[in-house]
Amino acid sequence: KAVVLGKAGGTAELPCQASQ
């Protein structure tokens, strides 16, 4: 899920990785 959001948002990729 985090990967999909990151690709759609772009900047979301950074916070998503931190969450993982």
Swiss-Prot record:
Stretches assigned to coiled coil: none
Transmembrane regions listed in the UniProt entry: none
Record's bilayer topology term: Single-pass type I membrane protein
Keywords per UniProt: Adaptive immunity, Immunity, Immunoglobulin domain, Membrane
First-listed, main subcellular location of the protein, grouped into a coarse class: membrane
GO cellular component, one term: membrane
Subunit record text: Associates with p56-LCK. Interacts with SPG21.
Function: Accessory protein for MHC class-II antigen/T-cell receptor interaction. May regulate T-cell activation.
Name the UniProt record assigns to this protein: T-cell surface glycoprotein CD4
